[in-house]
Amino acid sequence: MYKRQELEIKYILDLKDFPGDPNEKLFIKDFNIILNDPEVKVVVETMGGLHPAYEFVSACLKAGKSVVTSNKELVAAKGCELLGYAAEHNVNFLFEASVGGGIPIIRPISQCLAANEINEFAGILNGTTNFILTRMINDGMAFEDALKLAQDNGYAERDPSADILGFDACRKVCILASLCFGKHVYPDQVHTEGITEITLEDVEYAKDWGGVIKLLGRARKSEDGKHIYAIVSPAFVDHHSQLASVDDVFNAILVRGDAIGDVVFYGRGAGKLPTASAVVGDVIDCARHENKQKFFGWADSEEGYVSDYLDMPTALYVRARAQQKQQVISSAEKTFGEIKLLKRAGAPEDEFAFVTPVASERELRTKLETLLGAEIISTIRVTDY
């Protein structure tokens, strides 16, 4: 028979004082009160950062308390270890809110898609950068102006580095790749680029190609299935892709399984209520699985598990300038084979742009170095999502 279980907040740990707050009596400043209280079965960590979150969470798990977190930095760096502590002590470590805010993604991958072998995923994982790129694409705003608008609207921090340099998306890629492929992926294993070098000229060339520029976090299995590639970078996305129509602060994650094909998870990737929705959902899941651990986790990875991103197959968009433009274009056609030339209104006479065929990025960049007389202005990866 189903038995309803009541949940009650017993403590709120914070170093600040909150006089007059409706929950004023719940606030404490000593973590050990929580750790040593046998009535506390589930602990929620939302402080962010690696320390002291790691010390607090590991202590709780070792004390037989389940933990729910929204802390992507913690899970990306220490997820395998903390899941191990949870298994050892028959409790749960859940982190649905660490990727995609309120978008259900961790549980669907681990449960609903469990019958699939996941081959790859690609996602718009950061709302700040997606808002900036949307304004550049739809309104013709320069990067600096779009960033300021994002800050004015509360979508970007005063120091936006973690977002615009790709670090936030990198942590989410680590979590998703670990979950999808079964071995831990660490942040320093993921090649990471941001959007600070994207210009309106690139946006216009992407439009002529037939798509838009998005900051994508991606991972895929190698052909032999023994390794993976993982990368965060701007990418050309075809207009027909579901990812191309994801605008402003929304996130979307495309997952490719051998049985299901392509599945896309879409929604608000940040914000108080979406994040709270995911956190509370995990708390309820812990309550439903009291005294029994969910089969959930991954193994640690060996050296070389994440392959060099330069060996990953891709096409490249190339923007360049050359005094002898036609001669260099002819050389590019001989070097790369069939290339797609792009155009934009108002381009200088010496500027040109093209998209290469698919090859390993290492091979493509080696060939670019042989284009004598060409000054390469920018390159962006081209995807098939």
Q: Where do the PLM segments sit?
A:
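Flexible, glycine/charged-enriched surface loops at secondary-structure junctions
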Residues: E6, P160-D163, H184-T192, E290-S301, ...
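Rossmann-fold NAD(P)-binding glycine/threonine-rich loop
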Residues: M47, A53-A63, S70-Q111
